């Protein structure tokens, strides 16, 4: 899933 810029 896409978490954003947190990786």
UniProtKB/Swiss-Prot annotation:
Positions carrying Alanine amide: 7
Top-level taxonomic group: Eukaryota
One GO term (biological process): neuropeptide signaling pathway
Keywords: Amidation, Neuropeptide
Function: Myotropic peptide. Stimulates the contractions of the oviduct.
Protein name: Myotropic neuropeptide 1
